[in-house]
Amino acid sequence: MTLAQLRYTIAIAKAGSMNEAAKSLYISQPSLSTAIRELEAETGVEIFRRTNRGIAVTPAGEEFLGYARQVVEQYELMEAKYISKEQSRKKFSVSMQHYTFAVNAFVELVKQFGMDEYEFAVHETKTHQVIEDVRNFKSEIGILYVNDFNRKVLTKMFHEYGLEFHELLNCRIYVYMWKGHSLAKREKITLEELKEYPCLSFEQGGNNSFYFAEEVLSTYEYKRLIKADDRATMLNLMVGLNGYTLCSGIICEDLNGSDYCAVKLDSDEIMTIGYVARKGVNISALGKKYLEEISRYKDKALK
């Protein structure tokens, strides 16, 4: 196995075509095909499946590519430092479900370290994508929640993907809504009282299983349910349609504004917010600092 072969696999996956990849690499297609066949034979892994429509990456190939990207990136960092003599910037990337406090923690991290010597990335995305991002080394850390309902399924998935879940916060469930909502001044709300109002939920795409829902009580038969892709749309729906969503009770007015509130839901449900990371891989200094910032919200959760 050579560094060149690893670079070839990354180029093919990006292009989706052996011919296009060969052009970008400035080598002949037969030479590229031979190099990939030799790599697959050596590793015993079918990385690509040839189809009439081009090249498709196999599930085993996705895992292989995750490691290949890491090796190539590390080599390029060493090359920049010791050969090219260029000062490379340290990188930190995090993926998360839609949590304003997790974004706020990221903001504080960037403020502390600055962007002259560091390169940051934040991905607020779907549950399954959070897990995939960590699995494929796109992100070092993934922020999500588990509870009694989804714990078994997600734990099995973490194990299969070589990930570990670490607990950060335990929260009760709150109803997040516009302050102009007729129930906004209540101390506690039941699901029965909410049945005439639209429940807002984040769309999970092709992995739209109850187990991947970002909101607890995902199996409840809501009379009115609206899916949204982003937080801004959801906030607009809260005002325009008197909608609501279920949340952790950790409220950050810095990002959402002061026009919204959280009212305790009459439920014994507990959600555990934590992070997933690659098993056996040490968290970087930036990653540890980010987790410290998130832990500061432990005492800010509504009781």
Model-predicted segments: where are they?
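Flexible hinge/capping segments at coil-to-helix
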Residues: 157-199
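Central regulatory/effector-binding core of bacterial HTH transcription factors
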Residues: 89-152
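Beta-alpha-beta core module
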Residues: 160-166, 171-172, 232-281
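Short helix-boundary/capping micro-motifs
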Residues: 10-28
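Hydrophobic hinge/microswitch elements
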Residues: 135-140, 145, 204-261
